[in-house]
Amino acid sequence: MITRRGVLKFIGGVMATGAALGAYAFVIEPGFLLRTKHYAFAPPRWTPGLKLRLVLLADPHLAEPHMPLSRWQKIIATANDLGGDLTLLLGDYAAGHSWRTGSVPVAATAKAAAAIEAPLGVYSINGNHDWWDDRNAQRKGDGPVLAERAMADNGILTLANRAIRLTKDGQAFWLSGTDSMAAIVKGRGRFESRADINAALAAVTDDAPVIHMAHEPDLFMHIPERVSLTVSGHTHGGQLRLFGYSPVVPSAYGNRLAYGHIVEDGRNLVVSGGLGCSILPVRFGVPPEITVIDLG
């Protein structure tokens, strides 16, 4: 029999559950959790015997209280313990939402990144928020943006539509990168790209495998088969993700490119879940992550 006391207990239970879920999604998962996500595979056109470990740090969106400088420094210390040959910074260092109690200057973000240890180097690309956060770049319609200059001041090269040739154990490979596809704000929901995959790959002069850094995974649809692997961030895995589905994904392709290891037409893409938040400081089902990829 339904009683008033029973109804009140039920309502109280629902409210308590909602409060607990809200606290988890708005405080605990985005502000305190960190996982390491591992992938291991040999992509097409990969040199036999070439073993390479990539450590990806995507979308930190530094701002207090969820991603203060101290937390970024701890994440870097964790990344340094993962034994990466290369550490790749996939953009969006600037704050991604207005629900913050304090800002972190990009100069401080880059200075902390100088502590990253990787024998083959640390490389960066710009994210859309790095462009949006630079009023001068928006006015001129051109870079280099503040984040790129800050990284350069700390010895970190930004691969903005360019490529470099690297070697490990005498075996060569290329690392290329493109700028953001949503760099210049042209109006509500309208952006102008500064990504140029042709310019990035123009420097590739031999048949060594290519790893490409693209902030937005949508660029994957324009990546030629010549590229063995594309790595991206930007989506944060949708920030809300249940049973492999995210209701909102900042991609023209929705969940198709939201998160994880994606293989299409023999081409490989890994989309990191990233570290920070944008629009709202919320994460549920896709905690902040450091992404590790073992190739070969």
Place the predicted regions along the sequence by residue.
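Membrane-embedded segments
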Residues: 55-146, 154
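C-terminal segment of N-terminal export signals and the immediately downstream linker at the start
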Residues: 1, 19-55, 74-77
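Active-site neighborhood of phospho(di)ester-bond hydrolases with catalytic His/Asp-centered motifs
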Residues: 57-58, 87-92, 121-128, 159-161, ...
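Binuclear metal-dependent hydrolase catalytic cores centered on His/Asp/Glu-rich metal-binding motifs
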Residues: 134-156, 168-210, 220, 283
